[in-house]
């Protein structure tokens, strides 16, 4: 998929992403880097002021799906999550969260990705890692 079209879908056309402020930082074929800026509504643990785990898993899933989509030539293809595992390694702090995803395998109907999430201030310290499997549907009559 064209990187500019994928960026528009992720940032503007998916209401949930738009609500959270998801930004596509880098899009290459089979590899994406996206981020969500911190805001107080994203806190899930008020005692530690840690980011909600749902925000972390959402960003992992969005990055993984985008990595699959970025490798597809058919712009009308649909990508949906079949299975996803997220390992939470440390609390997310009150700052921008970044997710990098890379395509591990792309088949006709399935895509597999690895994801890594971190803060820009400490890129070597993973907040979470993940692996996901996505279903790919190419509409009838498409290439």
Each predicted region: which residue ranges?
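A generic structural signal for short beta-strands and their flanking turns/coil linkers
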Residues: 20, 30-32, 78-84, 95, ...
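Catalytic strand-loop segment that frames the active site of acyl-thioester-processing enzymes
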Residues: 23-50
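Short beta-strand segments enriched in hydrophobic/aromatic residues
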Residues: 38, 72, 134-136
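Active-site helix/loop of acyl-thioester processing domains in fatty-acid/polyketide metabolism
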Residues: 51-74
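Hydrophobic alpha-helical segments of small multi-pass membrane proteins
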Residues: 54-58, 62, 83-88, 115-118, ...
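Hydrophobic beta-strand-centered segment that forms part of the acyl-chain substrate-binding groove
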Residues: 67-98, 103
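HotDog/MaoC-like acyl-thioester-processing domains
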Residues: 92-94, 98-143
